[in-house]
From Swiss-Prot:
It is an enzyme of class 3 (hydrolase). Residues 235-265 form a propeptide. It comes from Rhizobium viscosum. Belongs to the peptidase S45 family. This is Penicillin G acylase. The gene is pac.
Length: 802
């Protein structure tokens, strides 16, 4: 792949062509200057931060007001008021697990003055545009408001925090402990206690010392897999898990229809001066939050005396998550640390609104919520629901028959506004110490990355992690009777972190941060077979690296058949041992060794280039079924998401490579299974398609940005063009921190401006980065004023005194 010339050509094109344009929209009045570059990205120049953040809210609302409204309503639990009863279940869960306006205001009031004031100014900026739009709805309200017949509301700081919660908080409000308990209970019923616990420990291990980590350390921790301390749970856990699981499926479906981000992953890399070819620190960002139109990321430049920053953040956030200021570049990925526990509450047989806690019956907190729901005939009705809360948190399931309830305990509950404030402080930091101080105040589970002008890099696994009672197993729910409460939180300095690591770089794809760190119910995310190995392999195969090298590594990771990393060498080895018995095996070895493990379509004919990729895909599926389907039987369906997870298939690898496991999953020779799968798949492909791999080529999988509108209704706004499927960030930033400041290239598809006129007309910048994204082209990362004005197509001013 010829990456370097693609990058050079597009950057050259961008800098040359706009320079002689006349700024028809230029306004000489004083105020905040809004400089729109040739991709529609606003670069804001203000005389103070208050004006800057108000302008920030204003331009975001101008570009994406309908999207902001959906996010706000998504957390507020008022979607069904606009779109009807199909969304009531989602609203109910949002209210059940969420906060009242009063509770959010209390959080905001506890913030330091500057972030508190600037969040308010950001909200004022959104309201400023709302006021303008309400006065001129035909021109300034996007088509969706007219189509669905409702008006936007003015915003407050509370709404800004709600938008933050709807995306960031959702990731950690998880209930996997119930699913694990369901699996364990069903296995116990089928296989008995002793055997089932061995199986469970293999499926949901506590700690895999072979798992790749972002912090490279010497030595290996002891493998933890014993479940001798498993707490006894009620038989009601199966019913509760199935109920909560169904509710979550409905929540996910309706949220995706509304365009709310639920798939939060991400990859990132930082390179220090010793590993960098230029001696400058490098940073790569690849937040994975889905592909929709308009996108979830909003790009902006923020400039005020003493503060300059350029980059992207999630829509509605008053800060930048992926970008750089004058002093350093920053990025983030989801940390997947264990910040949520489910507690099993014992209910009073005489009063199911009471639960046993520390030897006494306590009344649950009780509150009534009213929902305004739009009916099919357009008329609105009121629906009332009662919600309960224990000392541990919101009650997510109650079983009146078995007198058991389950509540959700979240370590960062009540601190969400503090985390927003911490991110704003990270934006304003001028050095590593100030960045680290901001990181120490962040309470949700993320990985933070830092690369500065001095060549220094740093990585922090941020978050507020509980110190749990060592008598319980954190993979399943905890008894809520008071004996097994959290004992506090791990000090920030003990969270995994590293500054200027010896290997010269840090990479992450939501993998394990360090050898000793575990993540409870989601431990199967962090195993020996993990997708981050794509970035590790890429870095280790190179000496000193450039941004172009990192881009090539990212390209490889985006198209890789992830199972090929560990399983292809095993397959080739077994084929080599048996090649004398069948001439086809030598041919397969040749094709597998030629294959670069990528599912790409460089000749753009609509088929993956390598026919052997079709063989490997089918071989893997066949092999996986042979390893687990017969052994698990009816349980195969509920465990496949573990054994064939998108992050890796570690248990399958341990089985097929003859590593030690607690339970004997394979009762025949592993090589025999590999050969059986090979012979079956080979016979099928040769019979159906032909003898040679060139005939096996399969059609590419495609994806679109916004095939449906934000509420699931097809639209024709120019983003239905299919492109090849990529396991890639929703945007990419590549930044080099030179002595003069940040430089580099980026792409934020499908485009900057999501506004659709009443007549359906879209902006030129609605999807102008879509084809570039598909072709791995980039635009220049604009930071200094001279370059920004060279690329400008419109300069206007906002008078903040009006």
């Amino acid at each position: 792949m010829k990456m370097k010339w693609l990058i050079s050509v597009i950057i050259l094109f961008v800098f040359i062509f706009p320079q002689n344009l006349v700024f028809a929209g230029e306004d000489k009045n004083e105020g905040v200057k809004v400089v729109r570059d040739n991709f529609g990205v606003p670069h804001l120049y203000a005389k103070n931060k208050k004006d800057l953040y108000e302008a920030y809210g204003y331009v975001m609302a101008k570009d994406r007001l309908f999207q902001l409204e959906m996010f706000r309503r998504g957390n507020e639990g008022t979607v069904s008021e606009i779109f009807g009863e199909d969304y009531l279940s989602k609203d109910e869960q949002s209210r059940r697990d969420g906060y009242s306006n009063k509770e959010i205001k209390k959080m905001i009031d506890g913030l330091d003055r500057q972030p508190r004031e600037l969040i308010a100014k950001f909200a004022e900026g959104i309201s400023r545009y709302v006021n303008e739009a309400l006065k001129d709805p035909d021109d300034k309200l996007s088509k969706e408001f007219h189509e669905y017949q409702f008006l936007p509301q003015k915003w407050t700081s509370t709404d800004v925090v709600r938008v933050y919660m709807v995306s960031m908080t959702y990731l950690w409000i998880i209930t996997r402990e119930l699913k694990n308990a369901e699996i364990l209970a069903k296995l116990e019923h089928e296989y008995g206690t002793e055997v089932s616990r061995k199986m469970f420990d293999d499926l949901v291990w506590k700690n895999d010392p072979s798992a790749p980590t972002s912090i490279v350390s010497e030595g290996k921790p002891k493998r933890e897999s014993s479940s001798q301390s498993l707490q006894k749970l009620s038989s009601a856990v199966i019913k509760a898990s199935e109920k909560v699981g169904k509710e979550r499926e409905n929540f996910v479906q309706s949220s995706e229809e509304l365009g709310l981000p639920l798939k939060i992953g991400s990859n990132a890399a930082i390179v220090g001066s010793e590993k960098s070819a230029t001696g400058n620190a490098l940073l790569f960002s690849g937040p994975q939050v889905g592909f929709v139109a308009p996108g979830f990321l909003y790009e902006v430049g923020l400039h005020a005396p003493g503060f300059d920053m350029e980059g992207s953040g999630f829509i509605g956030y008053p800060f930048i998550m992926f970008g750089a200021n004058n002093h350093f570049a920053l990025s983030a990925t989801a940390g997947y640390g264990n910040v949520t526990d489910i507690f099993e509450e014992k209910l009073n047989t005489k009063n199911s609104s009471q639960y046993l806690y520390k030897g006494k019956w306590r009344d649950m907190e009780k509150r009534k919520e009213s929902f305004t729901v739009k009916g099919d005939n357009g008329e609105k009705k009121t629906v009332e629901k009662i919600y309960y809360r224990t000392v541990h948190g919101p009650v997510i399931s109650r079983d009146e028959t078995n007198k058991v309830a389950y509540s959700k305990y979240v370590s960062f509950r009540g601190t969400e506004a503090q985390s927003m404030s911490a991110y704003m402080k990270a934006n304003w930091a001028k050095n590593l110490k100030e960045f680290e101080n901001a990181a120490s105040e962040y309470t949700m589970s993320l990985n933070w990355y830092y690369a500065d002008k001095k060549g220094d890099i740093a990585y922090y696994h941020v978050g507020r992690y509980p110190v749990r009672n060592n008598k319980i197993d954190e993979r399943i729910p905890t008894p809520g009777t008071g004996e097994y409460e959290w004992k506090g939180f791990i000090p920030f300095k003990e969270n995994p972190h590293v500054i200027n690591p010896k290997n010269g770089y840090v990479v992450n794809w939501n993998n394990k941060p360090s050898k000793e760190w575990v993540n409870g119910e989601y431990s199967y995310y962090w195993g020996e077979d993990n997708r981050v190995q794509q970035y590790i392999n890429g870095m280790e195969a190179r000496g000193k690296v450039t941004l172009e090298d990192i881009n090539e590594i990212n390209y490889t990771a985006s198209f890789a058949q992830l199972r090929a990393n560990l399983f292809k060498p095993l397959l080739i080895d077994v084929l080599d041992k048996n090649k004398s018995t069948n001439g086809n095996y030598t041919y397969l070895i040749e094709k597998l060794e030629e294959w670069n493990n990528l599912k790409e379509d460089e000749n753009k004919d609509g088929y993956y280039d390598a026919g052997i990729a079709a063989f490997f895909d089918e071989w893997w599926n066949n092999l996986h079924d042979k390893l687990f389907m017969d052994e698990l039987g009816d349980f195969y369906g509920i465990t496949k998401e573990i054994t064939d997870h998108r992050y890796g298939a570690s248990l399958a690898y341990k089985n097929i490579s003859k590593e030690s496991t607690n339970y004997k999953w394979v009762n025949v020779d592993q090589e025999k299974i590999i050969m059986e799968s090979t012979n079956e798949v080979l016979a099928k492909l040769q019979s159906e398609k032909g003898l040679k791999a060139e005939k096996w080529r399969m059609p590419i999988k495609t994806m679109t940005f916004g095939e449906k509108s934000l509420i699931g209704i097809p639209h024709g706004y120019g983003s239905m063009t299919p492109i090849i499927e990529m396991n890639r960030g929703s945007e990419n930033h590549y930044i080099e921190m030179t002595p003069k400041g940040p430089s580099g290239f980026n792409i934020t598809p499908p485009g900057q401006i999501g506004f659709v006129k009443k007549d359906g007309t879209i902006s030129d910048h609605y999807d102008d980065q879509l084809v570039m994204f598909a072709e791995w082209k980039f635009k220049p990362y604009l930071f200094n004023k001279k370059d920004i004005y060279k690329a400008a197509t419109n300069v206007s001013a906002l008078n903040m005194s009006k």
